[in-house]
Every structure is written in C-alpha cells, then in structure tokens.
C-alpha cells in the first residue's frame, strides 16, 4: 500500500508539472517601430528570414508545448495568416519543385500544433492580456512568452525553465542581472538563493526607482505560472502606467505558493528597441548558413572605413 501511495503521489506531481499551453501576448501597438508597425504586428518583424513570433513559437514547441494561445489586438491579422496554411503559395512552390522552400513554409506550424486566437479588446496591460487567455488555459500551469524578448539559449530558455518548474514545484520567472540604473524599465525581484541561479522569491516590484530596487535581478519575457495567477489578476488595481500589471498579481501569488526566479543560460536581445533588434539581426545573420560568410566579410569591410 505504501508503494502504491508513493507511486500515486509521484504521478500526481508529474501531472501538475506538465505544461501544455503557452500564451503569447501580442496586442501591443509597437509604437517604437512606427511606421513599420502601423499596419502590421511588431512580432512579425523579421530577424533575417523568420519573424520574432516564429522564434517564440519554436521555443515553446521545443519545450514540448503544442497549444499556442495568441492574445491579439487590432492590426494583428498577419500573425494569424503566418501560422495558417498557405494553399496558393504551397501549390506554386510544388509546381516549381522548390521542395526546400515548401518544407520551410510547411514547418512554420507543425501539424500537431494547435493555434488559438483571442482578442484583447482594450490595451489594459500585460496582466489583462494574460487574463484574456484564462478560459483557454484552464486549471493548469502554463507558460507566457513575450516575443520581443528574443532569448538565445541552448537548451532553449523555456525548456530550462520547465526543468526548474518540475524540480522546484512552483511558478518560475526568467531573470537577468541588470545595472541598477535601469531598474525603472523592469520588474525587479527579491529572494533567497536555493540553488545556483534559482531564487525563492519574497517580493517583486514593477519599475522601481534605482534607490528603491530590492535587487539587480530583473524579470524578462518568460514566465511559467500557476493558474491561480488569474484570481490575483482579477483583484489587481491599475498600477504603474495605469495598466493592470502582471507583476502585481505575481506579488500576491508568491504570498500563498512558491514562486522562483531563474537566471537563465543564454543571451537576451530586447527586440522591442531598435538597438536590440539590430543587434539580434546582426548576430543571427552571422550564423545563417545562406549569408553568414558574405555578411561577415561585409562587416569587416565596414569596420575599416
């Protein structure tokens, strides 16, 4: 009986640790990239030959997630079109026997991936965007990926986080160390280190002044959260910037269950800024098999002028 009980407890814990869904909040206006984003989603901006949102979905897919939930807004139809089947394009490529390109087009959304779209009616902040996905997520833990934070890691950063989620049995936020002077642009956490690069949180503050920041650990665009976060989002009052902040809901969540911060292994490109976007474009071009050699030569020639 004891053995059966232990097996059942282990199975229950494993079921609780399975992350089936990823939420992609993509309703933002993308004002930093106007006029390019006037009629198209900022998440569709390409890094070489793939849009940011595809990198994000691939990261979720490689972590074993097959249910992709997009919280969209006006002018985001291009995201739906990107992950839809392109019959005319595929037929044209098939007719010209361009099999490599045909494979690329078909691999954008594997057949075993389910993409669902829900509209955020008003731009009320990240917390509100996540709440829009509640009925689609259900009563189970889930991931959140902000596509304009391009995280380049191996294994992929979300895969690293799911391992921490399983080992620590709690919600997980990706964090990185920042210069304290930049704290006003991030959610900043405080906590106790329980393992290398893993912190059990006791506090989180949205965009604190440098003098008020509890640490130099800033949250970046990856989260693995308990479904209880939805109840806390509903109780959040508009915070910094007049929006419903996910950070405030996490601050309430960590008072009732474990929430951890994880210093991920990888490099972050802030593609919500022009400079970060350009850095990502250069770095990914330098490893792209089609253009890397010529592009590196070009960069060297530019450095001499």
What are these regions (language model features)?
Residues 21, 66-68, 141, 170-171, ...:
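Residues at the starts of beta-strands that form the adenosine-phosphate
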Residues 24, 70, 144, 173-174, ...:
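Structural beta-sheet core signal
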Residues 89-92, 99-191, 225-227, 234-236:
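Conserved beta-loop-beta/alpha segment of the NTase-like Rossmann-fold superfamily
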Residues 44, 115-117, 171, 259-261, ...:
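Conserved beta-strand scaffold positions in the cores of enzyme catalytic domains, especially
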Residues 143, 162-166, 193-296:
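Catalytic-core segments of class I nucleotidyltransferases/pyrophosphorylases
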Residues 15-95, 156-160:
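N-terminal glycine-rich phosphate-binding loop and ensuing alpha1 helix
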């Amino acid at each position: 009986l004891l053995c059966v009980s232990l097996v059942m407890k282990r199975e229950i814990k494993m079921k609780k640790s399975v992350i089936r869904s990823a939420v992609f909040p993509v309703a933002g206006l993308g004002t930093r990239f106007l006029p390019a984003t006037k009629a198209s989603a900022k998440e569709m901006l390409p890094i070489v030959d793939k849009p940011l949102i595809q990198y994000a979905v691939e990261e979720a897919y490689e972590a074993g997630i097959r249910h992709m939930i997009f919280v969209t807004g006006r002018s985001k139809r291009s995201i739906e079109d990107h992950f839809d089947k392109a019959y005319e394009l595929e037929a044209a490529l098939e007719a010209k026997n361009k099999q490599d390109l045909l494979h690329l087009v078909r691999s954008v959304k594997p057949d075993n991936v389910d993409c669902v779209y829900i509209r955020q009616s008003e731009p009320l902040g990240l917390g509100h965007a996540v709440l829009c996905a509640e009925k689609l997520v259900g009563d189970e833990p889930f991931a959140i990926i902000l596509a304009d934070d391009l995280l380049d890691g191996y294994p992929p950063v979300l895969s690293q986080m799911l391992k921490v989620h399983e080992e620590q049995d709690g919600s997980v936020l990706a964090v990185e160390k920042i210069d304290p002077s930049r704290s006003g642009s991030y959610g900043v956490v405080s906590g106790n280190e329980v393992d290398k690069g893993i912190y059990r949180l006791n506090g989180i503050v949205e965009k604190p002044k440098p003098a008020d920041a509890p640490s130099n650990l800033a949250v970046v665009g990856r989260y693995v959260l308990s479904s209880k976060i939805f109840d806390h989002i509903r109780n959040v009052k508009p915070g910094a910037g007049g929006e419903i902040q996910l950070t405030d809901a996490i601050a309430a969540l960590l008072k009732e269950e474990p929430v951890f911060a994880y210093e991920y292994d990888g490099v972050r490109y802030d593609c919500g800024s022009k400079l970060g976007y350009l850095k990502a474009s250069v770095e990914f071009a330098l490893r792209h098999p089609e253009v890397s050699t010529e592009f590196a030569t070009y960069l060297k020639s530019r450095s001499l002028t």
